Amino acid sequence: MAKTALKNKAAAKPKFKVRAYTRCQVCGRPHSVYRKFGLCRICLREKAHRGELPGVTKSSW
């Protein structure tokens, strides 16, 4: 889990646009965040398995 200070820092509007970065809305993880959902890969997988994300299905090929 991310520290509260880092979550707040990411939420604040930066002075320069290039300093902005995405964090997971659930756990605050800064890496591998899917912009479409606002979730990291781990939280995305958990929510998809529980059926909390409509339209997301497990792929099979």
UniProtKB/Swiss-Prot annotation:
GO molecular function term, any single one: zinc ion binding
The record's remark on the cofactor is:
Binds 1 zinc ion per subunit.
Alphabetical GO biological process terms: translation
UniProt: Zn(2+) binding residues: 24, 27, 40, 43
Q: Which domain of life is it from?
A: Bacteria
UniProt GO cellular component terms: cytoplasm; small ribosomal subunit
Which cofactor is essential here? Zn(2+)
Q: Which keywords, in A-to-Z order, does the entry hold?
A: Metal-binding, Ribonucleoprotein, Ribosomal protein, RNA-binding, rRNA-binding, Zinc
UniProt cross-references to PANTHER family, sorted A to Z: 30S RIBOSOMAL PROTEIN S14 (PTHR19836), SMALL RIBOSOMAL SUBUNIT PROTEIN US14M (PTHR19836:SF19)
> What job does this protein perform?
Binds 16S rRNA, required for the assembly of 30S particles and may also be responsible for determining the conformation of the 16S rRNA at the A site.
Q: Spell out the family assignment given in the record's similarity comment.
A: Belongs to the universal ribosomal protein uS14 family. Zinc-binding uS14 subfamily.
Subunit note: Part of the 30S ribosomal subunit. Contacts proteins S3 and S10.
This chain belongs to which protein, by name? Small ribosomal subunit protein uS14
Q: What is the lineage of its organism?
A: Bacteria, Bacillati, Actinomycetota, Actinomycetes, Bifidobacteriales
Q: Which gene encodes it?
A: rpsZ
